[in-house]
Amino acid sequence: MRLPLFAALLTLATPALAQDREVSIPGPQGALHGALLTPKQAKAVVVIIPGSGPTDRDGNNPLGVRAQNLKLLAEGLAQQGVASIRIDKRGLFSSAAAIANANAVTIADYAADARAWAAFAAKEAGLPCAWLVGHSEGGLVALAAGNAPTICGQVLVSSLGRPYGEVIRAQLKANPANAPVLADAYRALDALAAGKTIDVSGFHPALQQLFNPAVQPFLIDAFRQNPRELAAALKGPVMIVQGQADLQVTQADAAALKGGAPFAELLLVPGVNHVLKHVDGTPGDNLASYSIPDRPIAREVVDGIASFVTNPAR
């Protein structure tokens, strides 16, 4: 009985033997780096764009997120014949040398990098174009990258559908514990939305971190972006993926994106949260999943994206 079991395990493990290969493209001042994962015969290739702040190519960040969700997504896609490049954003991690100040960026800067990565990915895979798969804020970047010959289309995963400031306002209001700091938070949001920086030195420490003066110029730029309008300008295929247990980005965002791009394919995934993992419905388990790298990514997400990028016109 042991031999068949071993053979079965070997068969299941075989697709995971594909190894990451470090790749790079020119950046503004130094190289931009990423990890290329290529199956034996790639039917499509995607560029996976991470979310906000210091989030790395795998979906982790030093603020306590160790979900490894973007690496798991890449591995799952590889098993279905989809190659991927997971990127580190300019100024961060392996792309730290690309710019001197990681905070001196705009959404347009990130979008330009995404277009460059798409061209590189397509060439590496021997395909005419690459898909942009943006997670969370990465979806906004994918939207801003717009239309280009080497971009097949966009896959927007747990992506903002409302203006950035509106989403932050809703997130803060949703937590009753934030009630004592809401007035200051709203004052900061209003100032940034008006294109003005604000002194937060007298604010609660959590708000000082959220509205750190170093990132306020980036937030001002990000607040100007309207995801729905950007979606409406897209000419290629679009997929919207939204977990129904997401505590950060909600179905209201997915609906807004769908409103901008009625032709988009919408995948709503029950019981799946922001880091694309199944949770039991309790806030505790939802938040705990952010720091459990071994919890699998939702199969529905992998299957849906793989099916879409390999057959977008079905």
Question: What is each of the regions a protein language model found here?
Answer:
Residues 272-276, 281-314:
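Catalytic active-site module of serine/aspartate enzymes centered on a nucleophile-bearing elbow/loop
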Residues 41, 46-77:
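Short, surface-exposed "cap/lid" segments of acyl-processing enzymes
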Residues 68-96:
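Conserved alpha/beta-hydrolase
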Residues 69, 102-124:
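Alpha/beta-hydrolase active-site loop
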Residues 18-45:
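N-terminal cap/lid segment of alpha/beta-hydrolase-fold proteins
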Residues 155-228:
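Accessory cap/linker subdomain of secreted extracellular hydrolases
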Residues 234, 240-242:
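Short beta-strand/loop motif that positions the catalytic acidic residue
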Residues 119-175:
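Primarily recognizes the serine-hydrolase "nucleophile elbow" in alpha/beta-hydrolase
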